[in-house]
């Protein structure tokens, strides 16, 4: 075959050129993303049932649903968190499970239970988590002072953002969705005059009935006239606030308009949450891309739209934040520059060793050709350009150069002996084909057990394994098919300047002679490396994934008090103004509940806030975070505050925030976790010094109102009337919706706000005869402590406490055994990332052993010897010890990425 190729150089070069063209085309069409497009093995089920308390929701809906979803194939774990009116179940699967099939099966299991759920409950929402669910970036839309001076309101900005900005962005083909939060909503409020209602013997139910009777929409009708059929549209009675005021109510054959007995007004309100940007109220937009979109192009197109909108609307400011395109650009540019520098240095070293420009040129040409054609292989294999596949290409560059040097050096040696260059090329190439194939197999052999790793590690390594394998196959083909042709073309009339690097050979021969003359000493030093390597393994810090430095972070605050939205905003702004200057950082905050559809922040309570801080100076991170922490705990000592990394794709997939060690407590006596159980557990933990301070942020202080049905029956008051009265008294009773062309407004009944006891003390309720009685005669109020949320897994309810002052689970278990928890009917489970890390490193050890066995078998087959492969494999001991030593010296950790590198290099060095 080699003779056939070197005799047809034009055909070979044209074939290579065609492959290069296809490779360039493949590169321009490959998706570019930070990480491989993994199916994250997690499905979230969200349940909304406003008005039902957490305990009833857990018992009647969530518990049966959790038991049903446990039957979904491949479920590894299921956890639920239930609070008043809402719940979220998270199903975790192994990476070998198809999340598409699991998603379908989850929906089927939910459909089977819908018949037993209460009527009127929305169908649970099933969400499949994907890397593309992370917003590419956020847009903050802030009105200037001139905007308000022009007489415009925040509601107008909300309408403009929804109808113009959001739509303009979603028109881009690369954008899949734009989520929005921080809007003002218009609402029509009806505030009845209770004195007039009592005088006219009217009840709230009369007002509700009148509104619903007049606010109808029966759609389009049709009628026939001869041969023609016409559509008939019935116009609604209510289209404006004035129409609501003119609604008539019959009273003893007399009519009274609603506007005469109630104040009707249109208001704008933010709901239960707002968004601020650099201290001013703003609107936040989360921009999501399509799965296959090239992320680096999205930012440029968005910038054009932002400039157009701002030029037409100078009174609003649109700013990008949490820009993932910058993270991608930085990561990709870093890897590409590393690849280019590595290739350049390798070629320089080849030239210094060979001291022949033409031979160096052959290597310089063959490696880029292999890289370009490798992109065609990635396109066929369905692999995107990401940091994992690019790191695989960087690995491959050295191997490509090795293959080229081996072929060239062997041909060169035969060329020095043979006068016929074709014979030299033929003999030199055929001699090394088998060793090159064997070398490729030993390198690829370590990939087979690595792919079998459980969890994220195995899934991530698939891209790297395919990339390196494709690159090695392409490099092998280029080495045995193209390099001989290039050698003949470039070296046919040039043999005089082919020299060897004598200095390196002299140094190598002297070193080898020294080792052979003192073989016992060097053997002793070699065997001493084994205990050194073991010691370094225990000394090197271990973590699941490497630390990723960021110039931004989040601050999550729970005030542990039932503060209002206004008070929540006041506290957040006070903290930020006291600790953050405009020169140090840019900040934004979601205060209370957010209205994002795809984010868990929407589960945030009204007394919580999440602050995002983007640093302008990296060195300020520690001082800034500690300043926020100290100020908050000093001024609001009961609050719970957490400093968390900013959420990006790495945080979503790697989940580094998981506690190292936590204790999960279960009540084996009653199977229910309540506030008394939590306080008892906290007291035991404090006594045993497992925690330094009890944190009761999992408890809510609230009031319970109990209706006395016997008294209602005695005085002729219906349960519906008192429930309606309470809804109006303690909140807003949504009666109906007023539909317009492209929007809808809630029609609600409310009252002037007073404190709890004044409301109960001064309010009245009428019976069916029109007699009025004090509301306090029919209800009882008491103050209680309840769980903020009920947390469960497949074993039932639990209370989880992070343990920060314990290094290993073994020490923690011995501490638990010496406390009353061991014998008091309390179930205790130890969970955390440390345990997961143990499992992972045990798997890595197993993979390393399997890889060594495979390497031994391949080498034994190649050398037809059982002893020689053992001698060769002893080199790995020295290499692993050296790798651990450098990790220790440079204060790095042994993690998934470094462990993968060690195992892959074990195959490469052989």
Question: What do these predicted ranges mean?
Answer:
Residues 23-28, 345-352, 357-412, 857-910:
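Hydrophobic transmembrane alpha-helices and their membrane-interface caps
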Residues 181-183, 191, 260-262, 276-348, ...:
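Juxtamembrane "pre-transmembrane" interface segments
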Residues 79-84, 129, 158-288, 674-802:
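Beta-strand-rich non-transmembrane domains
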Residues 397-411, 433-452, 459-499, 611, ...:
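Transmembrane alpha-helices and their membrane-interface boundaries in multi-pass membrane transporters
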Residues 321, 332, 408, 414-438, ...:
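Helix-loop junctions and hydrophobic alpha-helical segments within the transmembrane domains
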Residues 57-129, 133, 158, 195-216, ...:
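Solvent-exposed, membrane-proximal periplasmic/extracellular interface segments of envelope transport
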Residues 1-32, 432, 485, 498-546:
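Signature of alpha-helical transmembrane segments and their immediate interfacial
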Residues 324, 636-910:
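C-terminal transmembrane helical bundles of large multi-pass transporters
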């Amino acid at each position: 075959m080699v003779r056939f190729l070197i005799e047809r150089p034009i055909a070979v070069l044209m074939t290579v050129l065609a492959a290069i063209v296809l490779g360039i085309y493949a590169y321009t069409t490959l998706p570019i993303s930070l990480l491989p497009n993994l199916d994250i093995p997690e499905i979230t089920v969200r349940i909304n049932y406003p008005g039902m308390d957490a305990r009833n929701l857990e018992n009647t809906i969530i518990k049966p649903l959790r038991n049903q979803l446990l039957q979904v194939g491949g479920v590894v774990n299921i956890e639920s968190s239930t609070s008043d009116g809402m719940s979220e179940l998270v199903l975790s699967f192994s990476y070998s499970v198809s999340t598409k099939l699991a998603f379908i099966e989850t929906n089927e299991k939910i459909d089977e239970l819908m018949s037993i759920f209460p009527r009127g409950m929305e169908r649970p929402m099933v969400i499949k988590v994907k890397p593309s669910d992370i917003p590419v970036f956020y847009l903050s839309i802030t009105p200037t002072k001139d905007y308000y001076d022009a007489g415009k309101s925040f509601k107008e900005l909300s309408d403009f953002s929804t109808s113009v900005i959001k739509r303009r962005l979603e028109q881009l083909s690369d954008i899949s969705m734009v989520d929005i939060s921080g809007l003002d909503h218009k609402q029509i409020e009806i505030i009845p005059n209770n004195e007039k209602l009592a005088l006219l013997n009217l009840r709230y139910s009369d007002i509700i009935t009148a509104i619903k009777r007049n606010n109808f929409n029966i759609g389009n009708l049709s009628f026939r006239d001869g041969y023609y059929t016409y559509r008939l549209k019935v116009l609604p009675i209510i289209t404006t606030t004035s129409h609501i005021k003119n609604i008539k109510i019959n009273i003893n054959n007399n009519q009274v308009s609603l506007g005469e007995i109630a104040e009707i007004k249109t208001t704008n309100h933010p709901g239960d949450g707002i968004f601020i940007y650099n201290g001013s109220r703003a609107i936040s937009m989360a921009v999501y891309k399509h799965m296959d979109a090239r992320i680096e192009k999205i930012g440029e197109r968005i910038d054009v739209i932002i400039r157009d909108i701002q030029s037409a609307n100078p009174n609003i400011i649109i700013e990008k934040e949490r820009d993932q395109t910058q993270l991608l650009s930085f990561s990709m540019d870093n890897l590409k520059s590393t690849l280019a520098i590595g290739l350049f240095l390798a070629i320089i070293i080849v030239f210094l060793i060979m001291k022949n420009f033409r031979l160096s040129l052959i290597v310089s040409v063959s490696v880029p050709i292999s890289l370009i054609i490798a992109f065609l292989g990635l396109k066929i294999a369905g692999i995107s350009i990401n940091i994992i596949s690019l790191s695989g290409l960087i690995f491959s560059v050295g191997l490509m150069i090795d293959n080229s040097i081996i072929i060239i050096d062997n041909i060169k040696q035969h060329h020095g002996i043979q006068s016929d260059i074709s014979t030299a090329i033929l003999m030199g190439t055929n001699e090394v084909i088998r060793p090159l194939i064997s070398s490729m197999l030993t390198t690829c052999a370590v990939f087979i057990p690595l792919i079998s790793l459980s969890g994220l590690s195995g899934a991530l390594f698939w891209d790297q394994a395919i990339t390196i394998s494709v690159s090695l196959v392409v490099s092998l083909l280029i080495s045995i098919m193209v390099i001989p042709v290039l050698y003949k073309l470039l070296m046919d009339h040039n043999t005089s300047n082919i020299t060897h690097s004598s200095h390196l050979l002299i140094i190598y021969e002297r070193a080898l002679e020294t080792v052979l003359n003192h073989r016992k000493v060097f053997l002793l030093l070699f065997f001493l490396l084994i205990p050194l390597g073991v010691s370094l393994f225990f000394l090197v810090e271990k973590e699941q994934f490497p630390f990723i430095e960021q110039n931004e972070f989040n601050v999550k605050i729970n005030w542990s008090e039932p503060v209002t939205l206004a008070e929540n905003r006041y506290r957040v702004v006070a903290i930020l103004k006291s600790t953050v200057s405009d020169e140090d950082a840019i900040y934004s905050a979601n205060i209370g509940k957010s209205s994002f559809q795809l984010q868990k922040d929407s589960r945030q309570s009204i007394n919580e806030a999440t602050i995002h801080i983007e640093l302008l100076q990296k060195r300020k991170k520690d001082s800034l975070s500690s300043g926020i922490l100290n100020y908050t705990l000093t001024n609001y000592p009961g609050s719970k505050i957490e400093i968390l990394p900013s959420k990006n794709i790495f945080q979503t997939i790697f989940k580094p925030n998981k506690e190292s060690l936590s204790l999960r407590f279960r009540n084996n006596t009653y199977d229910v976790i309540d506030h008394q159980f939590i306080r008892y557990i906290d007291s035991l933990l404090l006594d045993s010094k497992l925690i330094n301070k009890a944190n009761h942020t999992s408890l809510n202080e609230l009031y319970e109102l109990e209706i006395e049905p016997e008294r209602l029956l005695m005085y002729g008051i219906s349960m519906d009337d008192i429930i309606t009265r309470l809804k109006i008294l303690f909140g807003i009773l949504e009666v109906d919706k007023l539909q317009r062309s492209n929007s809808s407004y809630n029609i609600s009944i409310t009252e002037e706000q007073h404190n709890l006891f004044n409301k109960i003390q001064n309010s009245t309720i009428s019976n069916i005869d029109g007699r009025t009685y004090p509301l306090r005669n029919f209800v009882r109020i008491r103050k209680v402590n309840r769980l903020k949320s009920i947390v469960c897994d497949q074993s039932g309810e639990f209370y989880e406490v992070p343990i920060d002052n314990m290094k290993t689970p073994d020490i923690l278990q011995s501490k638990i055994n010496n406390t009353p928890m061991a014998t008091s009917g309390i179930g205790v489970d130890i969970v955390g990332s440390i345990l997961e890390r143990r499992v992972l490193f045990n798997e890595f050890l197993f993979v390393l052993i399997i890889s060594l066995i495979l390497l031994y078998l391949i080498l034994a087959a190649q050398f037809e010897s059982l002893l020689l492969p053992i001698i060769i494999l002893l080199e790995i001991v020295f290499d692993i010890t050296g790798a651990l030593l450098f990790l220790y010296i440079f204060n790095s950790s042994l993690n998934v990425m470094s462990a993968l590198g060690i195992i892959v290099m074990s195959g490469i060095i052989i």
